[in-house]
Amino acid sequence: MLIKGNILNVFTDEIYPGEIKIEHGIIESIKEVNADFNDIIVPGFIDAHIHIESSMLTPSRFAEIALRHGTTSVIADPHEIANVMGMDGIDYMIDDAKKTPLKYYFTAPSCVPATKFEKSGATISPNIIDNLLSRPEFVALGEVMDYNAVISNEKSILEKIKIAKKYHKPIDGHAPLLSGKNLQKYVKHGVITDHESTTKKEVAEKKRMGMKIMIREGSESKMLEKLIYSNCDFIVSDDLKPEDLINGHLDKCLRKAVDYGMDPYEAIKLVTINPAEHYNLNAGSISPGKSADLVFIDNLRDFTVKRVVINGNTIFKKQKLLFRANPRPIDTTLHVSLTKPEDFDLKAQNPAHKSATVNLINVSDNTIITKQSSAKLSIQKKTIIPSVFEDILKISVVDRYGGNTISNGFVKGFGIKNGAIASSVSHDSHNIIVVGTNSEYMSRATNHLIENKGGLAAISNQAKLDVTLPIAGLMSDKPAKVVANNSAKLNELVSNMGCELSSPFTSLSFMALPVVPEVKMTTNGLFNVNTHQFIDIIKEEK
């Protein structure tokens, strides 16, 4: 078959009219022709780092939207569902991905659980990593989140890194604010990428060490404008909500990059040839021998996708998608008893005391990095009381894996004036996490999730809404628009409750991730990521 148009060459930074001859899904030859065409043909877009589960969609439902935006391949790290269901969860992602023309490549989850300091539903051993990396659809070792384990030469993680080297597959990193000697130790073991950088200085140091840097432009962390001139290597999503995906994927990132001043040819390379070469994919350029994964766009400013071709087959054209997802539902149970309000109380050490100084988590918008601070709170009826007026709320993590333990603390930055929000999406172990103004609301929100087998929920003095996520408590089998509409209604309720965070449930979901600085809440209590130690909630009572 022949495909004609204005061809963009990622090697020479030129566009010329030509025809592409395709046989058996592979580009056979390219010939320049003397003709006038309207659209530009570019290589299919590749998202080099994404967790599909964060979209709350199954792989096939995700593909229904991503393909419309010119995404033809993704490098997916399934460590979210792996933390909940182990290999059963990974197999589910692979099986559902096969139902779509979108090319799914996977990374083997290296840190399940993310650290030894939290409880998850499964453990991914070196033997499992060996099995996964021996398979062609697994193209790398997934982000090595427990960088402290690497730095301290812990046996299990080094064994996983050794296995990746055996199969000559790259090792993805996760090194927020890692610097100096510790960064050099991390890189020395073979970790080659990072998507956690937030400053040009951080990027520069990692680049000097030979790392390849991914600019993260997702729903919560948006670094594209800040790092656009930092000589980065890829643009990635990492975590993307369904409502954001509907409005654009890598096509939207390209529009932003050009608006911020990046050369469009360079921007396109960050989502085509660069990830293809790094992960050894037969894609990324329009050249002989490569897969015929092509995207027709209107121009190099708007990047409006007109047509998508994968393996020579048209998948999307004239605003019509030529495939339909049919995900398989799976039954998931949260192995936790219904809670009582008193389960969320933090008791004073001495009931005679009137006040307590507590350590707490400080949350900021559009970043998953938190800060540790302290505040003085009153003690009433032997219980430490939050200060809603000062935006100091209660935060709890509920063990969903049969332990029936609840750890309680305090958080500042959510702004909720009455009610509670709860989620079974809680990186990376995905226990239930809940923030609220009092224990009664927190118990009601948590029990609502337990009864619904997972999801997101908000309860105030006026309303109750949810997004049900029956697949591992992480994903829905419903279409993206349904999930996005339900999510939008839920976020509107949370906004009416006083929360000013742009993505409250995304922010909430990262409050229990003990590999991103500075302090996080786990099933075992408040954890300082920098010192790698648990912290007492109560500093002092009087």
Curated annotation (Swiss-Prot):
Its cofactor is Mn(2+). GO terms for biological process: adenine catabolic process. It is an enzyme of class 3 (hydrolase). GO terms for molecular function: adenine deaminase activity. Keywords: Hydrolase, Manganese. Pfam families: Adenine_deam_C, Amidohydro_1. The keyword Kinase does not apply. SUPFAM superfamilies: Composite domain of metallo-dependent hydrolases, Metallo-dependent hydrolases. The keyword Hydrolase applies. Its EC number is 3.5.4.2. It catalyses: adenine + H2O + H(+) = hypoxanthine + NH4(+). It comes from the Archaea. HAMAP family: Adenine_deamin. Belongs to the metallo-dependent hydrolases superfamily. Adenine deaminase family. This is Adenine deaminase.
